[in-house]
Amino acid sequence: MTENPYLQTSTQPAAAGQTHILDETECWRLLAENSVARLAVSDDLGPNIFPLNYLVKSQVLFFRSAPGSKIVSLTQQPRVAVEIDGTDGGKRFSVVVRGDVRRLNDDAHIHESTVDTLPTMTGSDKWNYFAITPRQVTGIRFRTSR
């Protein structure tokens, strides 16, 4: 059996108290203060991840998309996960939203959510609007050595 070369350079587990579970209110605050996430979907080939810019309104995540594999995946399997991470107050955080995505077809709902005004990362036209209704929102905050 070959020895694991990474075992010798691995860091020790975080000391007790360095990782904190965030309550849902704090998770929503972080989600509202950020606008870029990763969208995890699943299709016939398995999991896939897409960069995503989003907005939060009434504890629902809204985004827009151009036609392509992301929309195909969302149609095949509407259960998704969204993850954001970053630095807040000198500590790292990660927030994960698991939920169900639905396409928005009603113009009034699209305008009310303001997703139609959401800038796109690529600057391309994106006329497909979606909402993610959370089933679960979780988050952690932790210190790093960097």
Task: Indicate where each model-derived feature is located.
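Short, surface-exposed beta-strand-loop junctions and turns on beta-sheet-rich folds
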Residues: L45, S69-V72, R146
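Short, structured beta-strand-loop surface elements
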Residues: P67-P134
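Extreme N-terminal tail/first-helix region
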Residues: M1-A32
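A short, compositionally biased
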Residues: A32-S35, Q76-Q77
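General beta-strand recognition
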Residues: V60-F62, A131, T138
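Short beta-strand segments
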Residues: N34-A66, V82
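Short acidic/glycine-rich loop or secondary-structure boundary segments that cap or lie
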Residues: I49, F62-R64, I71-V72, K91, ...
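Short, charged, intrinsically disordered terminal tails
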Residues: T138-R146
